[in-house]
From Swiss-Prot:
Keywords, alphabetical: Cytoplasm, Queuosine biosynthesis, S-adenosyl-L-methionine, Transferase
Location relative to the cell: Cytoplasm
Species this protein is from: Halalkalibacterium halodurans (strain ATCC BAA-125 / DSM 18197 / FERM 7344 / JCM 9153 / C-125) (Bacillus halodurans)
Protein name: S-adenosylmethionine:tRNA ribosyltransferase-isomerase
Gene: queA
NCBIfam families per the UniProt record, alphabetical: PRK00147.1, queA
C-alpha cells in the first residue's frame, strides 16, 4: 500500500495546542466499524456504548519530564538534552542539541549544579550516551529540572505538567503520553466500574519514534521503532476471563492495542510477559486481541492512522476523519477522541 493512501486534509487550526480545562469535556466521535456510520457525542457518553462485562485496557505508563536545559561546564554554551532510554545505572541514551560539538568527556551542568552529565559515547543522528551525577533520587531531581517533551506540532508551553499525564499514570518511562487516556477522570473510571465494566492495566513506554514520519512510499517497507511493554499475571487472567465470558476487550489508545496484539500474536491467550515490540499494524492485519478502540485523531500518513484504518477499514476511517474536520473536532495529543466498535456485538 502507498503512504499517500493514508493522507487527508487537515487545517492547522484544528491541531489542539492546549488541553481543555476539564479532561472529560472532549468530544467523542463514535464509529461503527461494520457500517461506517458515525455519531457525534461527548466523551462521558462512552458509558452508553461500553457494556457490563466489557473490559477497558489502559496504559499506566508515566511520562518522564525528559527535556533538560543545561550548559557546558567548560564553555558555558547552552545545551538541550532529551532523555530517550535508560541504560545501565545512571547512563541514558539521549538526543542532544547542538550535538556536533558535544564530544566524549564533555560535562553538562543543569540547574544550579545539582545535576551534571558526562558524555561517555557518541551515537548516530545526534545521539549521545550521558552518565548523570546527582544527590538524592534521580527522578525527584528530574521532576524539579525537567520539562515535558511535548510533540513537535505543539507550540504552546504547558502550564501544568500533570495535564500531560493520565490520572492512572504509574510506571515511569515514556517520552510521550498515551493520549487516549488523558480524557479519563477518576470519576468517569468509577462510573464505568459501577456499570460492571472491568478495568485492566498494561504498560508500554512510548518512545519518540511514535512521532517519526513514514519515509518510504510503500508502507510495507517501513520499519517500526521498538518500545518496552509489560503485562502482569493479574491482567492476563482478567482478559482471558472476559474473553471466555463473551465480553469485549476495548483498548484505550494505540499503545494498549499494540501491546495486546503483540501478546496475542505470540500466544494463544493473554499471558504474563514483558519485552520489546515493534509490531506494525496496517490494513490487512487480523486482530486477535482487541474488539474496539478508543483513540485520538492522528497525523496524516502516520503509522497510527494505518493502525486505526486496519481496525475500522481505511475508507470508513478517512470518511470519519473528513466528518471530524468538517465538524471542527480537535486533533492530535490534546484533541478529541473517537471510539471504534462493531454495533453488531453491542447488546
Amino acid at each position: 500500500m502507498n503512504v499517500r493512501d493514508f493522507d487527508f486534509h487537515l487545517p492547522e487550526k484544528l491541531i489542539a495546542q492546549t488541553p481543555l480545562k476539564d479532561r472529560t469535556a472532549s468530544r467523542l466521535l463514535v464509529l461503527d466499524k461494520h457500517t461506517g456510520a458515525v455519531e457525534d457525542k461527548k466523551f462521558p457518553d462512552l458509558l452508553q456504548f461500553i457494556e457490563a462485562g466489557d473490559c477497558l485496557v489502559l496504559n499506566d505508563t508515566r511520562v518522564l519530564p525528559a527535556r533538560l536545559f543545561g550548559v557546558k561546564e567548560e564553555t558555558g554554551a547552552q545545551v538541550e538534552v532529551l532523555l530517550l532510554k535508560q541504560m545501565e545505572g545512571d547512563r541514558w541514551e539521549t538526543l542532544v542539541k547542538p550535538a556536533k560539538r558535544l564530544k566524549v568527556g564533555t560535562i553538562i551542568r543543569f540547574g544550579n549544579g545539582e545535576l551534571t552529565a558526562t558524555c561517555v559515547q557518541e551515537l548516530e543522528h545526534g545521539g549521545r550516551v550521558l552518565e548523570f551525577s546527582y544527590e538524592g533520587i534521580f527522578h525527584e531531581v528530574l521532576d524539579q529540572l525537567g520539562e515535558m517533551p511535548l510533540p513537535p506540532y505543539i507550540k504552546e508551553q504547558l502550564d501544568d505538567k500533570d495535564r500531560y499525564q493520565t490520572v492512572f499514570a504509574k510506571n515511569r518511562g515514556s517520552a510521550a503520553a498515551p493520549t487516549a487516556g488523558l480524557h479519563f477522570t477518576e470519576e468517569l473510571l468509577d462510573q464505568l466500574k459501577q456499570k460492571g465494566v472491568h478495568l485492566a492495566f498494561i504498560t508500554l513506554h512510548v518512545g519518540l519514534g511514535t512521532f517519526r514520519p513514514v519515509s518510504v512510499e510503500e508502507i510495507e517497507e517501513h520499519e517500526m521503532h521498538a518500545e518496552f511493554y509489560q503485562m502482569s499475571a493479574g491482567t492476563a487472567r482478567l482478559l482471558n476471563e472476559v474473553k471466555r465470558q463473551g465480553g469485549r476487550i476495548i483498548a484505550v489508545g494505540t499503545t494498549s492495542a499494540r501491546t495486546l496484539e503483540t501478546i496475542r500474536q505470540e500466544h494463544d491467550e493473554f499471558v504474563e510477559t514483558s519485552g520489546w515490540t515493534s509490531i506494525f499494524i496496517y490494513p490487512g492485519y487480523e486482530f486477535k486481541g482487541i474488539d474496539g478502540l478508543i483513540t485520538n485523531f492522528h497525523l496524516p500518513k502516520s503509522t497510527l492512522v494505518m493502525l486505526v484504518s486496519a481496525l475500522a477499514g481505511r475508507e470508513n476511517l478517512l470518511n470519519a476523519y473528513a466528518h471530524a474536520v468538517k465538524q471542527s473536532y480537535r486533533f492530535f495529543s490534546f484533541g478529541d477522541a473517537m471510539f471504534i466498535y462493531d454495533k453488531k456485538t453491542n447488546s
